[in-house]
Amino acid sequence: MDDFAQEWPNLPRSDNGLQMDQLVGDLPTDGGFEPQTRARSNTWPCPRPEPVDELDSTKASNQQLANGDPQQAMQNANAAKKNSSRRNAWGNLSYADLITHAIGSATDKRLTLSQIYEWMVQNVSYFKDKGDSNSSAGWKNSIRHNLSLHNRFMRVQNEGTGKSSWWMLNPEAKPGKSVRRRAASMETSRYEKRRGRAKKRVEALRQAGVVGLNDATPSPSSSVSEGLDHFPESPLHSGSYQLSPDFRQRASSNASSCGRLSPIRALDLEPDWGFPVDYPNTTLTQAQVQVFDQLAGSMADELKLHTDMLQQQGFSAASGLPTQPPPPYQPPQHPQHTQGYALNGPGLSPNSVTTTMSPAYPNSEPSSDSLNTYSNVLLEAAADNAALLVQQQQQQQQQQQHASTLIGQCLEALNSEPIEEFNLENFQGGLECNVEELLHQELCYDGMLDINIPLAAVNTNATNVILTNNSTNSSSSNSNNSVAGNSSANLQLSQLQAQLQLQQQQQQQQQQQQQQQQQQQQLLLSNNNNNNNNSLDTASANLNARVQYTQPSVVTSPPSWVH
């Protein structure tokens, strides 16, 4: 207090505009009142420790590790930082520094995770009483976090099976403060490189004479590119900032701004594969269009046959159950209400079914009467559906058989047309026939004459052939060469009989093939009927199971899905 009792110096007062620095310079200075820097908040800060230079400390620790004395390195690091405040409870070293000392102290410069834990407990006094499982969860988690976070540590697979991996110091890590692994979105170097490449590409295209960003027709890129025409003096027109030709805002899209699309084709930034850019308009003739329409219609009819059958019936297995969530629980009511429900199915009138049903409520028992009636209705509807399916399949089978019979009749009609050359009724009377010349001419072929006569034609003209044979026999008997005539007639008859037998065999084979085809079609139809019946049985069983599981005992009000 004696210092404050001294008189303060009297400053000379002057009005001649002296500077403040000159006035302050005349004041006595004291070592304890040196000017201090102020923070950005313009308040005098409390004295705080100076920031620790982590780069120097890491270099010192790395040098001590290179000398091979981790304990001395820890002591030197603590001595260098004795004037600063402690960063952690055990000292100024971080978890990464402790792990580095632990790995560097090993003989082979590698440790497992459990060995790092043991080194911490043995060498750091703070962790000596925290080695048990209850108190070590926190700092062990921090060690694992730092091992996976820093680039200076690398993980090496252990040679033995079932053993933990080795942790070693990464020799390729940068010296000084270790760089933390960042996410891909935080690394801006790649983004800057990509952005620079885009700028260079756009500038090269612009220098080559490619213009078309801001033409008369606006492009759906962005409001910035659209405003460049209205503000030609904008700095965006300068060469320092160029928009990409395919630039588009995130909010806009081609779907939302299709009316504002520019007809100008985008710049050829994609590789050219040699294909023409504008494809010609291919037009089909009317005949091709009709053929395609018929083909599409037949395919659509075949695909939608089953669905149309179900729609015509007006009843499906899935539509027979309510799909709405159950309402909240209500107290049970003893009187039951009987309500008529109409099922639009074949063979069922709207008033022919009367059931007792209610939606599924929790904490309620199923009603046997309502279950039985509802299941009976569903079974009857399923049976009607099966009967309709069988009828439709029978109709299809009959149509197929009718078509096959029509084809067979047409073939028979074609084969049964009599050949005019062999029809003797068409010849007029009074004709003369030189039988001797005819027999002589036929015998000259040495039995190689082949006459193909259809079976129907032979059947219709059998009497005529027999008459002609008799006439030839009589004429030959009257002639001098009766023996030769009889032998030739017998040869002709034998040939005709052989041909008739061959034709009969061929027709029998054709009939057998047709019968086999009909049997195969019947087997396929029967298999389809069995599959449909099995599917209907399973569907009805599933419906019965679902009905028994969801129906309640007490009826309070009709379900909302019934109309």
UniProtKB/Swiss-Prot annotation:
The modification Phosphoserine is found at residues 185, 253, 256-257, 262. SUPFAM superfamilies: Winged helix' DNA-binding domain (SSF46785). Residues 323-334 have a biased composition (Pro residues). This is Forkhead box protein O. GO terms for biological process: cell differentiation; glucose homeostasis; negative regulation of cell growth; negative regulation of cell population proliferation; negative regulation of insulin receptor signaling pathway; regulation of DNA-templated transcription; regulation of lipid metabolic process. It comes from Drosophila mojavensis. Residues 1-72, 177-243, 317-371 are annotated as: Disordered. Residues 90-196 bind DNA. GO terms for cellular component: cytoplasm; nucleus. Coiled coil: none annotated. It comes from the Eukaryota. Keywords: Activator, Cell cycle, Cytoplasm, Developmental protein, Differentiation, DNA-binding, Growth regulation, Nucleus, Phosphoprotein, Transcription, Transcription regulation. The lineage of its organism: Eukaryota, Metazoa, Ecdysozoa, Arthropoda, Hexapoda. Transcription factor involved in the regulation of the insulin signaling pathway. Consistently activates both the downstream target Thor\d4EBP and the feedback control target InR. Involved in negative regulation of the cell cycle, modulating cell growth and proliferation. In response to cellular stresses, such as nutrient deprivation or increased levels of reactive oxygen species, foxo is activated and inhibits growth through the action of target genes such as Thor. GO terms for molecular function: DNA-binding transcription factor activity; DNA-binding transcription factor activity, RNA polymerase II-specific; RNA polymerase II cis-regulatory region sequence-specific DNA binding. Interacts with melt. Residues 58-72, 216-225, 349-358 have a biased composition (Polar residues). The modification Phosphothreonine is found at residue 43. InterPro entries: Fork_head_dom, TF_fork_head_CS_2, WH-like_DNA-bd_sf, WH_DNA-bd_sf. It is found in: Cytoplasm; Nucleus. It holds the Pfam family Forkhead.
